[in-house]
């Protein structure tokens, strides 16, 4: 809904997903099974498909809102190549989400540039009470240049500790612009999250 069909590719190493794409006439690219992260997969795609920017919607965000893809595109147009990496975020409404180690939290400056991203509850206070926070939404835009930088380096120090690939960009000095998105997307990090997605889909119907 957000972009022309011929601009969309499914990047996968799984033949089952490839077969599904064939059945529904969806473009796909087979990537290697050596990709450690989704961004590694996009790096492989960037070597096969020429573009200035690559928008990546992770497969574990099945309810991603097409309007949020438009938000990324609008931000790219507005910033006019000022940033090489863009990442979605939204506010956190529940204490459970704030303290969940499965959910990366983000802090950023007044220019909406990412300062840090962590599985820990940030920002925190002396009383360890939830007050306000923001979480990552797994919608990204990468310039070809940023993917080349990402691709030539192995996992960086904080990236390895947190297991959050976007930290590699920060550690390599690449600015990350945060883009506000809706709260509708439900990331699937653990098996229990599948139930949440199915429940949400049933409610839509």
Specify the residue positions occupied by each region the protein language model found.
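Short, acidic, metal-binding catalytic loop of nucleotide-sugar glycosyltransferases
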Residues: 1-5
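Conserved alpha/beta core of the MobA/IspD/sugar-nucleotide pyrophosphorylase nucleotidyltransferase superfamily
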Residues: 131-205
């Amino acid at each position: 809904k957000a972009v022309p069909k011929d601009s969309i590719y499914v990047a996968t190493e799984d033949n089952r997903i490839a077969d599904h794409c064939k059945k529904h006439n969806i473009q796909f690219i087979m990537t290697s099974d050596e990709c450690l992260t989704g961004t590694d997969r996009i790096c492989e795609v960037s070597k096969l498909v020429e573009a200035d920017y690559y928008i990546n919607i992770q497969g574990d965000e099945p309810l991603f809102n097409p309007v949020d893809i438009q938000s990324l595109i609008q931000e790219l147009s507005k910033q006019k190549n000022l940033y090489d990496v863009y990442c979605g975020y939204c506010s956190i409404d529940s204490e459970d989400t704030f303290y969940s180690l499965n959910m990366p939290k983000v802090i950023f400056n007044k220019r909406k540039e990412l300062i840090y991203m962590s599985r820990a509850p940030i920002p925190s206070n002396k009383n360890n009470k939830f007050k306000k926070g923001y979480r990552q939404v797994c919608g990204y835009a990468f310039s070809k240049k940023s993917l080349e930088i990402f691709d030539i380096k192995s996992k960086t120090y904080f990236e390895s500790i947190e297991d959050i690939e976007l930290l590699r960009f920060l550690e390599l000095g690449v600015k990350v612009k945060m883009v506000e998105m809706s709260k509708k997307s439900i990331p699937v990090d653990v098996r229990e999250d599948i139930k949440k997605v199915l429940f949400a889909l049933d409610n839509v119907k």
